[in-house]
From Swiss-Prot:
The record marks K177 as: Arginine finger. The keyword Phosphoprotein applies. It comes from Arabidopsis thaliana (Mouse-ear cress). One of its GO terms (biological process) is signal transduction. This is Uncharacterized Rho GTPase-activating protein At5g61530. SUPFAM superfamilies: GTPase activation domain, GAP. The keyword Thylakoid does not apply. Keywords: GTPase activation, Phosphoprotein.
Length: 376
């Protein structure tokens, strides 16, 4: 019995391996056939693609070889080259223009620097000799009048300013109150220091002329009313008779100049409906530059023709200033075209304001013995 079962298993095993080998050979043959077919198809596809690419290239090349196409391509290349050339030329032109503009700016800056240097050197030469013979700002009023050799004991600069205002500026709003242009007034100061007989250019704003007049009075070493008579004149402000007697103690130059200035202010106040400056408003603006104590001089005016000091100065520093002090540097501090401060409300001397208002309102009654001011 066992031998019969073993023989059956051997036969089945041999049959199984025999059939498996047959199936494997068949599968291998099938796979080989499939791979061969795939390779054949791939070969055909590659050849087909290559043929199509070659055909397309030949077609494009044939088109490019046609005269019309070749001409169009040439035109396109020429246009591209022309456009590129235009951009290059434009870039070169713009560069040249920028260089030219830069050169002009450099030349302008050099001219301004040279002119400023010339002005500084001129002032240095003048101040090396002490006070220049032509200076009017910062110089005692008696010396100025003596130099001008005029029969009229009034500084010419005041006469020219007043004449200009009478002719063109009485109706200007806020006259003697509105701020002036620093740069312009510095130019006028320089012009009058070099030529006291210079005329005010046409077209100058009356406000700037009024500021120039106001500044000249502030630049005087002593006020028109003098330090010695300050208290006496102040105490006389309530009496025309006492005021007249006190003013007669002034020197001839101070007396006539004070009469001249207050006569001008009277004319301005008569146009107050137009210029908004009545006698009180004018007195508020002009008192600080006409009448001040030794310890209360109008410092705000010093700041625009000399650099402000960082430390307190003695009262006589104004007369001994150097040209470096008198010439402000445009590159420092406020812009040169900024306005000039024309008052210091924190230090207003209301007694002096009342004196000047009295001199304006009662001018003709107080200055009875003065030569009548005649405007041209």
């Amino acid at each position: 019995m066992p031998s019969l079962i073993s023989q059956q298993w051997q036969e089945r095993t041999s049959g199984f391996f025999s059939s498996s080998g047959t199936k494997l050979r068949e599968a291998g043959q099938t796979a080989g056939s499939f791979v061969g077919e795939v390779a054949k198809d791939a070969k055909v596809n590659v050849a087909d693609v290559a043929e199509r690419v070659g055909s397309l290239f030949k077609s494009r090349w044939a088109i490019l070889q046609q005269p019309a196409t070749r001409h169009a391509v040439q035109e396109h290349l020429i246009t591209a080259a022309a456009t590129t050339g235009t951009f290059v030329r434009k870039g070169i032109t713009e560069t040249k223009e920028k260089v030219s503009v830069g050169k002009i700016k450099v030349e302008e800056a050099a001219k301004k620097t040279a002119q400023k240097s010339k002005t500084i050197l001129t002032d240095i030469e003048r101040w090396q000799k002490g006070v220049a013979s032509s200076d009017v700002f910062g110089v005692a009023i008696e010396i100025t009048v003596q130099r001008q050799e005029s029969s009229r004991p009034i500084p010419l600069i005041l006469v020219k300013c007043a004449d200009y205002l009478i002719l063109t500026g009485l109706n200007s709003p806020n006259l003697f109150k509105a701020e002036g242009d620093r740069k312009l007034i510095q130019q006028l100061v320089s012009a009058y220091n070099q030529d006291p007989r210079a005329s005010i250019p046409e077209g100058v704003n009356p406000v700037d002329v009024a500021a120039l007049l106001k500044y000249y009075l502030a630049s005087l070493p002593t006020p028109l009313t003098t330090f010695e008579l300050y208290n006496e004149i102040k105490d006389a402000r309530s009496s025309i008779h006492r005021m007249r007697q006190s003013l007669q103690k002034l020197s001839n130059v101070n007396y006539n100049t004070l009469e001249f200035i207050t006569a001008l202010l009277l004319r301005v106040s008569q146009k107050s409906l137009l210029n908004k400056m009545d006698s009180h408003s004018l007195a508020m603006e002009m008192a600080p530059v006409i009448m001040w104590r030794e310890d209360n001089r109008p410092e705000s005016y010093r700041e625009y023709w000399r650099r402000p000091s960082r430390s307190p100065k003695k009262s006589n520093d104004f007369e001994t200033a150097t040209p470096w002090d008198l010439l402000s540097d445009e590159g420092e501090g406020p812009d040169a075209s900024s306005s000039i401060p024309l008052d210091d409300i924190a230090r207003v001397d209301f007694g002096a304001v009342e004196v000047v208002q009295c001199l304006i309102e009662h001018h003709n009654a107080i200055f009875t013995d003065a030569a009548e001011t005649v405007w041209r």
